[in-house]
Amino acid sequence: MEEKMKHFVGPDVSMKETAVCVVDDSGQRIWEGSVPSSADRIAATIREKAPELLRVGMETGPQAVWLWHALRKQGIAVDCLHARRAAAALKLQANKTDRNDAFGLARLVHSGWYEPVAIKSLDRYRMRAVLTARERIVRMCTTMINQLRGLAKTFGLMLSAGKGQVFETSVRRVLPDDTVLRDLFESLLSVLSGLKDQRRAFDRQLARFAREDEACRIVSSAPGIGSLTAIAFVTAVDDPARF
C-alpha cells in the first residue's frame, strides 16, 4: 500500500487575514491562499487543504498565544517559531509578501530546523496580565504624585514628606485660594485616588490567585516570598519540566 504524502502548513497571521501555505514531503507548494484570521476558519482550511497534516508552524507575535491555544484545542499540531529566527529563513524568499512568508514558514517547519517556542497556559497569561496591569497602575501613581509635587513647587506650596494618605492630606492642607489651581489639584488627587482604588482591587485579585494556585502556594511558602513574587515567578516559569 502506497504511503500517503505528509503535509506541512505555514500560516502568516495578520489582524484581518492569514496567508496559508501547504507543502508536501518534498517541500513543494501544493496549496496556498488567504482566509480570515479566525481560529475556526484557519483550522477548517488546514483540515481541508492538508488532510495528512504533520505539523503547522507559525511565528511568535501578538496573536500567537490565542491562536496556538485555539488550534491545539481543535486537535491541530502546531508549533510556534521564534520570530527573529524565522526571519532569517524568510529572508531567503525573493520577495517579502504574506504569501511568500507563509511558504517560507511551511518550508521551515517541513525542514525541522527550528526549536519550538514554549507557549504558556492561558491561566498563566491571565495571571501575568493582571500582575502587569498592577505594575502599570503603580507607575501611574508614582507619575501622578511626582506631578503634584512638581506643581506644588511651581506655585510655592510646601508639602510635608510622606507617602500614601499622608501625602494626599498634605496636598489638601495647602490647597490655594486660586480656583483654577484648586480645581486642578482636586482633579489630580481624584485621579490618584481612583488609581489607588484600582491597585487595591488588583492586589485582592492577585492574592486570590496566589491562594488558589498550587504552584503559587508552594513558592510563597518560602520565607520572604509574598504573593506578588510568587505569581511573577510561577507565570514566568509555567512548566518546570521544560527546563
Where are these regions (language model features)?
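A detector of single, family-specific signature residues
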Residues: M1-F243
